[in-house]
Amino acid sequence: MTTFFPAKVPTRYLRGQRLLKVTGVAALALTLFSAHASAEEKGMLETIHKHKFLTSTVPDNGDVNPYAVVVAPVSAGSIQKDDVLIDNFNNISNLQGTGTTILSYRPSTKETRLFAQIPQKLKDCPGGVGLTTAMTMLKSGWIIVGSAPSTDGTTATKGDGCLLVLDANGHHVATWAGPTINAPWGNMAVRDFGDHATLFISMAGFGLKGPEVIDPATKYPEVRHEATVLRLDLKIPQGKAPEIESQTIVADGFAQRADRDNFLFGPTGLALAEDNTLYVTNGMDEEITAIPDATTRTDSAGKGRLVTHGALLAWPLAMIMTSKGHLIVNNGKNGQTVEVDPISGKQIYAHWLNANQAQSPPGNGNLFGIALAPDGKSFYYVEDDINSLRIATP
């Protein structure tokens, strides 16, 4: 089933299979070098001291470049509560926008299995399938995942993509596509009530050309400001797949850019606070902004209110909210993750997750997806340089 819907008017050549070890100076940096932005404030990252390898994220078909990390909120189908779902953006040839697999890691048994493999050429999804960081599992057991497809690994052949609905056994049951969906990109923010839910997804593909289209002023691919954040309000009938009741563009005007090494840059991290403020990372501008009344607003807030900019942020990507209401955001330009107090706007702490000296700066391009662990004290993250799932713990 494909659902098309009109708009309510008013966002990485990565290191595929190259196995690199963090040793020597890099290991020392990983454990010792953390940057304090404020000595007075304490946060979650200051308590993190261990980084444990859990599993490879490469399935039998050879897909690489793990993106999304999602912790299962319930047991349903083949999934047990607290299982960790990870998807891949690249295929065995390391072409971006061609990954089709989702893996499931079970912390209780340390077992990893293939949860879903979606056909790469899916006619209802414009351009096919290339799974992104935009993935969630609802309390009703349904999985929703974004596709930003390509045929040559660059945005020159990018399709508009879609959102795919899977059941709890990994079967594809519905496709959502339409004029407001174009490269669903960043980690989803969700407000889930069981029989209905609200999703927030960044769309980073509108007007995007290939990386060969260069801005003569910058000598880089041209930057456009057409990326949006889309809110989908869903109803979830008992025993049936979710249905879209309404949809609203709650933010727009974010910077986006094609990139040969990174596929694209665009808004990536989304986190929803209890007061219904939606926080968004804007990597190109190295900032985090706030969208007020995100669950109820009927128009776009533009880019929203600036929360923090620059300093420890270096191409901020995926983001989570801690139990204390702080934001933790992974950097794309180095291997650090950064903690921010969104109320004061203070950047509290930066912590090395990946200090691989093979990149410059260390860890450049190695981090992406992140998810809070059920204990609220730890978090899962993926390392793209060695295609792995890890956990950071006290």
Language model feature labels by segment:
Residues E41-N61, S108-V129, V165-P184, K235, ...:
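Surface-exposed loop and turn segments in beta-propeller and other repeat-based domains
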Residues G99-P107, G159-G170, V223-K235:
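Beta-propeller blade signature
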Residues G283-E287, T308-W352:
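Loop/turn-rich, solvent-exposed surfaces of beta-rich toroidal or solenoidal domains
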Residues N94, I102, L163, L208-K209, ...:
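Structural signal for beta-propeller blades
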Residues V58-D82, G97, P119-I143, P149, ...:
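Beta-rich, blade/repeat-based domains predominating
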Residues F89-N91, S147-S150, K158, D192, ...:
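Short loop/turn segments immediately following the C-termini of beta-strands
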Residues N366-P394:
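Blade-level signature of beta-propeller repeat domains, shared across WD40, Kelch, NHL, RCC1
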Residues Y105-T109, R231-P242, I291-D299, D341-Q347, ...:
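Short loop/turn segments immediately following beta-strands, especially the blade-tip
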